[in-house]
């Protein structure tokens, strides 16, 4: 394990003081793509995960040219401090964080507690569009060491040399349901990847949306045999919830070798010849 990096988290107080600083850009990324327009942190820009943080033609993360265009149009260059936040305890803020790290952005942080905490504290919200002077952004070569692909997951299952963490709900893990309530059922089969441990993503957070303490998180994962000594692969349904768990293990606990399998259950659950476990 490496030393943890608490500088990847900022408080709501910090954001209130620095949101409009030169060199800082606050970005909201929500599950509910209408939330930003209903009110957001003054000075923030909004990214739509369904159109701006994925390849809309090929199932994949955002292509590098689209990422560069998105960041540049958001007033972000390579030296900008990006502060991400969103609803649902920062589900898609973590998804954006993971992709930004893949493309090598150095200073990217998450506002602890997300939109939930900001609103609960009665802080200001704005419906005004943020003024963003267009900048030039140049992404680095994609760091695929942060991402697990199907062959690696298949090898991990066969060799049993990596820990698999299923971050979905218990009902998804057991196969009782195929997707969270209200979301499309995109899989043919229910269950989980053989050998995976069930550690639902929500257990990483307190009731106010903030992350649990280092000691609490370390104990929770250790109780399931996840200590960071062996490689870890996290997955969910499409990779967004598991990106939050990846963030916790990689940046809050300091695990050296942890990857997000964004193919997740929509890939594995539909794959011909792939084994599925059910209790």
Task: Tell me the role of every PLM-derived stretch.
Residues 256-279:
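Cysteine-dependent PTP/DSP-like catalytic domain, specifically the C-terminal lobe
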Residues 164-220:
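A mid-sequence, solvent-exposed acidic-amphipathic segment
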Residues 21-25, 106-107, 161-162, 231, ...:
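Short active-site oxyanion
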Residues 51-82, 197-231:
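Helix-loop module immediately N-terminal to the HCX5R catalytic loop
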Residues 61-159, 176-177, 191, 241-259, ...:
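Thiolate-centered catalytic microenvironments shared by cysteine-dependent enzyme domains
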Residues 1-34, 115-188, 276:
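Flexible, polar/low-complexity N-terminal or interdomain linker segments that lie immediately upstream
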Residues 36-43, 97:
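Glycine-rich loop at the start of a catalytic domain that most often binds anionic cofactors/ligands
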């Amino acid at each position: 394990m490496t030393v943890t990096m608490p500088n990847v988290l900022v408080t709501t107080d910090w954001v209130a003081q620095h949101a409009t600083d030169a060199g800082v850009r606050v970005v909201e990324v929500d599950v509910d793509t209408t939330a930003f327009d209903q009110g957001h942190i003054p000075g923030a820009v909004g990214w739509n995960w369904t159109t701006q943080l994925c390849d809309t033609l090929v199932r994949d993360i955002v292509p590098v040219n689209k990422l560069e265009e998105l960041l540049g149009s958001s007033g972000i260059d390579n030296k900008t401090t990006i502060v991400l936040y969103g609803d649902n305890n920062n589900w898609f803020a973590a998804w954006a964080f993971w992709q930004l790290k893949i493309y090598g952005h150095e200073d990217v942080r998450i506002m602890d507690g997300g939109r939930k905490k900001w609103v609960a504290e009665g802080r200001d919200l704005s419906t005004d569009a943020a003024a963003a002077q267009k900048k030039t952004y140049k992404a680095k070569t994609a760091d695929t060491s942060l991402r697990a692909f199907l062959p690696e997951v298949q090898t991990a299952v066969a060799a049993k040399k990596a820990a698999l963490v299923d971050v979905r709900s218990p009902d998804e893990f057991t196969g009782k349901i195929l997707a969270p309530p209200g979301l499309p059922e995109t899989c043919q089969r229910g269950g989980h990847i053989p050998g995976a441990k069930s550690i639902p993503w929500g257990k990483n957070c307190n009731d106010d949306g903030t992350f649990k303490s280092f000691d609490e998180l370390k104990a929770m994962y250790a109780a399931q045999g996840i200590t960071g000594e062996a490689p870890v692969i996290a997955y969910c349904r499409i990779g967004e919830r598991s990106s939050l768990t990846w963030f916790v293990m990689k940046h809050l606990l300091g695990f050296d070798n942890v990857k997000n399998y964004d193919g997740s259950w929509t890939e594995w659950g539909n794959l011909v010849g792939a084994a599925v476990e059910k209790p």
